[in-house]
Amino acid sequence: MNVLYIILPIILLVSLMFDYLYEMKGKNSFEIVSKMGMGYNLANTFDSFSYFEDIETPEEQIRLNGNIPPTIEMIKKIKKYGFKTIRFPVTWMYFIDDEGNIKSEWMIKVKEVIDIIIKENLYCILNVHNDGHYIGWLIRGMEVKDKYINLWSQIANEFKDYNEYLIFESMNDVYFFDYYFDYTTLINLNQAFVDTVRNSGGNNIERLLLIAGANDELGLTSSLYYELPIDQSNKLAVSIHYYIPFEFVLGYYYEPYNWTDSEGILYTNGPNLIWGNLLDYYQILKDFELMKSCFVDKGIPVIINEVGVLTEEKKEIVSIREYLYIVFSFSSDYDGIMCCLWDTSNKIFGDMNFYDRTNDIWYDEKIKHNFFQISRGKYIKPKDYFINTTFESIDISYDFYSLVINFENKKVLKIIINARLTGVLFVDLELIVQTFNKNFDIVQIDYGKDNIKKQYDGTYNFIIDVSKIECYYMIEVFVSRGIKYITLNNLTLEYEESFLSIDYKSLKNAISNYIY
């Protein structure tokens, strides 16, 4: 046999491998993230775990939360709705031994799903998911470092010849204990992850690696204590979960309860079922600007790999639509940031349910339509509504009891309160404004009692000058007595310097057709 018949195919194969490695090396992390579009989580399948049941077979784990294993048809349909990335969360703990050796039957199942996703030219994010849960093993940190390295060594070697569409994510939601976060352990294991994957060779040398944030929370990850690993390939992205504000996104429903104050005024306290006021929008603007300044501007793209809202807790559907639309439109409008929807899919077992993967049914047609439009670039772009201003005006469109405003270290000159007064000539009414410094010390209290009692029924502006005090942190406005005689309509803050804000009313009006 001519030796060329043996050598030539080998030469061609090696040449193709080097060509592809060169192609991967030519794309930086931002170019890859920009192609990833919107993402979708195959939640509550391979990531499932149980507090009470023993899991002995892959099928038991995959179906534990009522979802079926991903199929070719399922992935094709998810792609059809506009998603270009599939996050594939995997919990490994039931099918690895004490040294981290993976059982073959589990690796086979994992590989089947990845092959389906990659075949559809979708990006696939593979991770180590609930192994970091408090019932898992990864929570033990440095004690199990060798096991963690061994686990990733096997995963990396299994998939080292896969193309750039496969992305590895180091871990998920770990190392937060009560009010203390173990940055040292996270930094150490993230570095071990990068070193292990890069040293496995093949396409892993240039693969995009997604580095777990500090408990994947934006606040903890943007801290000066958080550090990204050293990577000679310079191909990293940082992982963030966006469940903000907690009270709306993750707050469970509870029966409202009432109480009466000393004046006989009835108050009601209940769950936060609505979202979408100016402060909500400004929170998202502030958070995306924080991601931009902390990571994107420093050469690190951000993958927000979990976004969602509890759908089974009686939250207003319009607010759910609005929240998802705004978050995903922000991520689409910011270079270097992309989002993945967390979808548990099954209403019996899941708590964030948007699309029934088993039966190809969206639970809300507006949400389905909005995702598809955003994927095509046909969405209201938030940056078109950004403004620079020295004023911040907040409509108080809910029952008022106490309102807290955080200045984010901006110097406030005036606080202007617009209120409707009724019957105040005959009652003892106190409107209180407290200002705080960065140490939460009260630096000024304004009692509006004397001024208010001189007013007749009507709508008035009460102006409080705070320009000569240390008013850089926050204020609290509340009515201590006579709340039934006053309706607060609006609060305006005048700042010393201009800042980036949103033309809230115009943006709110622009997206109305997408949420109603």
Provide a role label for each language-model segment:
Residues 26-208, 213-223, 348, 367:
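Active-site mouth of glycoside hydrolases
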Residues 146-280, 289-309, 333-337:
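Active-site region of glycoside hydrolase catalytic domains
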Residues 313-391, 501-507, 511-515:
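Aromatic-rich peripheral "rim/lid" segments of glycoside hydrolase catalytic domains that contact
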Residues 382-408, 443-445, 490-516:
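Glycan-recognition and processing domains
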Residues 396-398, 440-470:
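Extracellular carbohydrate recognition and processing domains
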Residues 408-416, 469-472:
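Extended extracellular/luminal ectodomain segments enriched in beta-structured repeat modules
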Residues 424-435:
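Beta-strand acidic-aromatic groove motif in beta-rich domains, primarily in extracellular
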Residues 477-484:
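Short beta-strand-plus-loop segments that form exposed binding edges in beta-rich domains
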